[in-house]
Amino acid sequence: MRLNLSSQIVLNKVPVEFYKPKTTVEYSEISRMEKIHTDIFASMAEGASHVADKIEAGIKAAQQEGKFYVMALGAGSSLYSVYDELVRRYNEKTLSFRNVVVFNAYEYYPLQKDSSLRTINQLKERFLDHVDVAEQNIFTLDGFVAQDAVQDSCRLYEQRIKTFGGLDVALIGIGRSGNIAANEPGSGIQSMTRIILIGNTSREEMENSEQTKETIPPCSLTMGIATLLSAKSIYLTAWGEEKAEIMQKVVENSITDTLPASFLQTHPNVHVVIDLGAAHHLTRIEHPWLVTSCQWSDKLVRSALVWLCQKLGKPILKLTNKDYNENGLSELLALYGSAYNANIKIFNDLQHTITGWPGGKPNADDTYRPERATPFPKKVIVFSPHPDDDVISMGGTIRRLVQQNHDVHVAYETSGNIAVGDEEVTRFMHFINGFNQLFADSKDCIISNKYKEIKTFFAKKKESDFDTRDILTIKGLIRRGEARTACTYNEIPLDHVHFLDLPFYESGKIEKLPMTEKDVEIVRALLQKVQPHQIYVAGDLADPHGTHKKCTDAVLAAIDEEKKAGAEWLKDCRIWMYRGAWAEWEIENIEMCVPLSPEELRAKRNSILKHQSQMESAPFLGNDERLFWQRAEDRNRATASLYDQLGLACYEAMEAFVEYKPL
């Protein structure tokens, strides 16, 4: 069973020569916008293996010379794949770490006794406890030191590094604000190991990624920029689309102290190692026509023309031969003969993505429509990772499908219980206890006792405590109620609302369990029961908690199993991927766009507002300060505005989709 099919989704196939040039000359040409040596790999696994190769070579070279190999190690998640690869090599007895000295790059401060937040513990759990680094060769900053001794402790750390001859390598990740180790924006290039206040962006990122509910301390003790730059070599890793924007700034923009990682441009032996997702906004990947000749696919042509329109502030049909020639797109003139021909081609392509009939228009020519006319009506399943992703991402389309008489089912894949605040449980428990008092004279002892039990638990609950199973069940029940209310508002029958409660989610923690065949079989059973003509599935694979990806993998694996079994229903089924909760589709990838009127957008907002537990007090709103309904409206309006700017019809908002073809 293939459980990771989402990782094989390639919307824009990047030619290998763009990220893996064959010669130094080719690399120099295609990377001329880049100020740091950057190695791009097709996947995280390939990139991690490359870094591990370099680390292994350094360790073995030092062993042959009878020297220590001194490493500064970060504890960020982008390094986990590298650590896993190094551990694998140790287990296969091809690599020993007996001569390695480790210095932890940063530590939280101040730490409470028995704190689960210690970054050195994370390093040990992920890497050091699984290899043969001598305990006496592992050094970390002291998160427990008294405040008046912090500076002395930091100076001592610098001295210890020097006693081993300095750092041979620094292996680090990068934060959303461009921070390396814990060096926040504003850090100077001369900064040494010191105490530093954790910035708001870094704090949000930590709170979303740390597998604990313990409060993040206000400060960090960190190696300074100068300390990191003193290393003989530096490897910075980043994976996934969520790191694409910051990596473009670090690699291609000028040095600035507002972007600490940009100081790496001054180092003679620094290597940025990223995958295609993190490289997405680099010029050679996103706008390759500016640095090299291109193989012009339809998507790349569309991307280039949209870029040109935005740069010049013109609609597509007003672009001229001069515009093409002056902006690096003369190849398109040779390919199409004139700007007019290219303009018409892309204008029509975009026009054909727009449809007010997401389920297909009956008795109509569907030659240029994104969805086929028959069968009509269609059986539809909308898979929603959490109990509100359906309305956030495609609430307008769902209402349109229902109004056009399609048989719409909604499948909520997870309970979403950990995303409900304690005050919501308290409010509902007050209600049910009051109900018991009013209508049962408090005679229902189960309700009375459970009310007291939960009230006592919340009164004594610490931030590091996890909820009991009963409380998680109640939180899941709250979200079920909200989902049913939203479906009723959208006129979806309650017997068409399915709560799958996939087991991988039920860890009670931010970190979920692995997605397994058990999850897939639950999804597959629903597919076999409904046998849909249309499936809508989350394509928001960059969500910060990873739930969307696992949910999508479960659906794609179930479809894959049905395909292997020769299921007849799948032969007449189309699968559409939506976004909206965390990002929007790039216009070159959009294959169906459903316009919304002002009234329809308001109805979509009302659907989202039915999920009251996910408003201001929701625990996991992510790094975006806007509420989910605001994000959804802004993204939908932005899509409509872009179509308008390109010279197409002007709508209030639009929901975009990309078709998935089973691999």
Which residue stretches match the model-derived regions?
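ATP/nucleoside-binding phosphotransfer catalytic cores, i.e., glycine-rich phosphate-binding loops
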Residues: 2-12, 25, 30, 226, ...
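N-terminal glycine-/serine-/threonine-rich phosphate-binding loop
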Residues: 2-70, 366-367, 374
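Histidine-anchored nucleotide/phosphate-binding helix
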Residues: 82-93, 390-415, 419
